[in-house]
């Protein structure tokens, strides 16, 4: 059985890790970095860039460069948070037929799950390159406060990327796993995981207990805000810069998409610099132009100014902390350790606020960017059966229930219930001779169902005629270890039953997922062909270069006819390569022609090398001879220092 990898699918950055024995390994991507920007760019030629290459070109291609898509995953287009993002994002957020929020690139509508799958595929490839074998299984993390739709959409993204998602695990819980297994402290400890990432905020209170040599991680409570994170901090800086520039120059940059993308980069950079320095300068020449000519932006921002701009955002993290402490039934003073997770927790003001609330310094020995992926990898090892000393008891973040008479939300499973869990309750009809009931399932804490998130609805039909209140309908809720809900309704008199896995009125249908999986597989096949074509072209280029070099040095030793034959074959190959031919067989045939024509040249070189005999000359000629000889024979090795850029074609519908 292959390894189960751990993936932290983040709003801003993603990370992949795996276990080697009892050691965890955070894997570097093809660019040599341990985290990968969660940015996907769709290019004019159908190429898809993921990570750092996508980020680098974002300024020139803002409308087709998608970032922070995790904020949209599993969300309805009408939700106020989505509506807010529509005005801020340079790319288009559109309404899908089922009411979900989708995105658009080059006129193609894409599901957030489909876009996130590109990042997951990059993580999968990163792990495969490291292991040298295929990877098919993963544990993927989500914010603890993600609802059912968002969890299901994340699972769908894994499937589209070609991964069997063995478990969806909450990010703070994963960080607690990474922290708890790394520390030698004995006895029971209560920890608070404060997770402020790129787009989401979570707070979890977790108890780590030693039970007969086994570490038991029990989540006591969780709370958060799935629309609060580093992206919002960046936006405050962007808004401030736009306001200052408008005051000075009279130009509104908020309408200029290219300028906005440059501002986003500058804001992120300034925010990072202000975590260590007291002041930073934003300098963006030629940010825009008007009738009077080009305009340049130069602005100093102090740490105090940044803190004033984001003060209310930091304050918004405190109320969830209060609720989590209350729900866990503990006092602030009983918390032994506070763990900071997520890049935004590097901001000194955030750390100060956390210290002020919990009354103690947060731990500094946890890597906020990697802890979540590490925890996911540990859970992967537990699920594969290779680790027996860890037990994880997670909770459902929000209450689940059904709508009953008068639009009331009747809770079936309360928030912070340990999962997996089951609960059944008997209900009856509201009218005489009612032949069917509609079960509407909601998630949330409001008293009235309409104030909560509708997860889905289904009917139980064929109820025998009877006065109201007589039929007995048993509704059962079953939450699995991924936090995903399965609901059933049964008429106890007839035994008629209807069971569903909640897949909201929204979400991707099975057919849509299958199509996206097939598209991804087709793209993988296309990638392979493109890779082979690139190899052939590189081989051709290298052969042209080495043969020309050899001709310059040794051409005068050949007969005129032989030299002309080589030159003609070279010209033919060069033209094919210059025309951008996508016929691999034709390129290989022309390489073979050059190789055959160059045999005499190779012989002359070796003869000359032997005749000279001197070590220096032998070395020089040997190098040239090897180049022409090996490639003339059609060898396909590429120069050691040539790295093929990853690229991928996406077919338009």
Swiss-Prot record:
Q: Does the keyword Oxidoreductase apply?
A: no
Where is there biased composition of kind Low complexity?
A: 627-639
Q: Does the keyword ATP-binding apply?
A: yes
Q: What induces it?
A: By stress conditions e.g. heat shock.
Superkingdom as given in the UniProt entry = Bacteria
Task: Note the InterPro entries from the entry.
Answer: ATPase_NBD, Chaperone_DnaK, Heat_shock_70_CS, HSP70_C_sf, HSP70_peptide-bd_sf, Hsp_70_fam
Q: Where is this region: Disordered?
A: 612-653
Q: Which UniProt keywords apply?
A: ATP-binding, Chaperone, Nucleotide-binding, Phosphoprotein, Stress response
Q: Which GO terms describe its molecular function?
A: ATP binding; ATP-dependent protein folding chaperone; unfolded protein binding
Q: What positions are modified (Phosphothreonine)?
A: 200
SUPFAM superfamilies (UniProt xref): Actin-like ATPase domain, Heat shock protein 70kD (HSP70), C-terminal subdomain, Heat shock protein 70kD (HSP70), peptide-binding domain
> Function, please?
Acts as a chaperone.
**Entry similarity comment:** Belongs to the heat shock protein 70 family.
Tell me what this protein is called.
Answer: Chaperone protein DnaK
Q: What is the organism field in this record?
A: Paraburkholderia phymatum (strain DSM 17167 / CIP 108236 / LMG 21445 / STM815)
State the encoding gene: dnaK
């Amino acid at each position: 059985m292959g390894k189960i990898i751990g993936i932290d699918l983040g709003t801003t950055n993603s990370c992949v890790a795996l276990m080697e024995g009892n050691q965890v390994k955070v894997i570097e991507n093809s660019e040599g970095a341990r985290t990968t920007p969660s940015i996907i760019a769709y290019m004019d030629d159908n190429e898809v860039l993921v990570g750092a290459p996508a980020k680098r070109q974002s300024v020139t291609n803002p409308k087709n460069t998608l970032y922070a898509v995790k904020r949209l995953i599993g969300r309805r287009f009408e939700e106020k948070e989505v509506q807010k993002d529509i005005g801020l994002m340079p790319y288009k957020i559109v309404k899908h037929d089922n009411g979900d929020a989708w995105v658009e690139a080059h006129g193609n509508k894409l599901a957030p799950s489909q876009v996130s799958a590109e990042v997951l595929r990059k993580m999968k490839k990163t792990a495969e390159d490291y292991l040298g074998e295929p990877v098919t299984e993963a544990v993927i993390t989500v914010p603890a406060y993600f609802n059912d739709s968002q969890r299901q959409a994340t699972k769908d993204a894994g499937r589209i990327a070609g991964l069997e998602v063995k478990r969806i695990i909450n990010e703070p819980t994963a960080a607690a796993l990474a922290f708890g297994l790394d520390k030698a402290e004995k006895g029971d400890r209560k920890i608070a995981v404060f997770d402020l990432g790129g787009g989401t905020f979570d707070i979890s209170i977790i108890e780590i207990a030693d039970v007969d040599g086994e570490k038991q991680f029990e989540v006591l409570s969780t709370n958060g805000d799935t629309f609060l994170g580093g992206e919002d901090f960046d936006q405050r800086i962007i808004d401030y810069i736009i306001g200052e520039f408008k005051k000075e120059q009279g130009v509104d940059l908020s309408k200029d998409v290219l300028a906005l993308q440059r501002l986003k980069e500058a804001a992120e950079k300034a925010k990072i610099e202000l975590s260590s320095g007291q002041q930073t300068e934003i300098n963006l020449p030629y940010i825009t132009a008007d009738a009077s000519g080009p305009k340049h932006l130069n602005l100093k921002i102090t740490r105090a100014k940044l803190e004033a701009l984001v003060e209310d955002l930091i304050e918004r993290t405190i109320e969830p902390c209060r609720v989590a402490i209350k729900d866990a039934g503990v006092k602030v003073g009983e918390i032994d350790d506070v763990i900071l997770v997520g890049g935004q927790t590097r901001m000194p003001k955030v750390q100060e606020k956390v210290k002020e609330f919990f009354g103690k310094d947060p731990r500094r020995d946890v890597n906020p960017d990697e802890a979540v992926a590490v925890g996911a990898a540990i859970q992967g090892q537990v699920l594969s059966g290779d680790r027996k000393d860890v037990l994880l008891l997670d909770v459902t973040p929000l209450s689940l229930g059904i709508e009953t008479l008068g639009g009331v939300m009747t809770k079936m499973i309360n928030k912070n219930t340990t999962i997996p869990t089951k609960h059944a309750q008997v209900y009856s009809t509201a009218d005489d001779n009612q032949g069917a009931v509609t079960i509407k399932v909601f998630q949330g804490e409001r008293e009235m169902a309409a104030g909560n998130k509708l997860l889905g609805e289904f009917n139980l039909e064929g109820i025998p005629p009877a006065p109201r209140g007589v039929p007995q309908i048993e509704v059962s809720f079953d939450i699995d270890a991924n936090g995903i809900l399965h609901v059933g309704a049964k008429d106890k008199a007839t035994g008629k039953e209807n069971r569903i896995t909640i897949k909201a009125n929204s979400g991707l249908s099975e057919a849509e997922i299958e199509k996206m999986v097939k598209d991804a597989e087709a793209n993988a096949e296309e990638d392979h062909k493109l890779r082979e074509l690139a190899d052939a072209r590189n081989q051709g280029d290298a052969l042209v270069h080495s043969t020309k070099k050899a001709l310059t040095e040794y051409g005068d030793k050949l007969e005129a006819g032989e030299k002309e034959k080589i030159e003609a074959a070279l010209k033919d190959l060069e033209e094919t390569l210059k025309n951008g031919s996508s016929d691999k067989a034709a390129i290989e045939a022309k390489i073979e022609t050059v190789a055959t024509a160059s045999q005499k040249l190779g012989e002359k070189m070796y003869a000359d090398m032997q005749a000279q005999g001197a070590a220096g000359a032998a070395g020089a000629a040997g190098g040239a001879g090897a180049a022409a000889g090996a490639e003339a024979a059609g060898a396909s090795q590429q120069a050691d220092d040539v790295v093929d850029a990853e690229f991928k074609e996406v077919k338009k519908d």
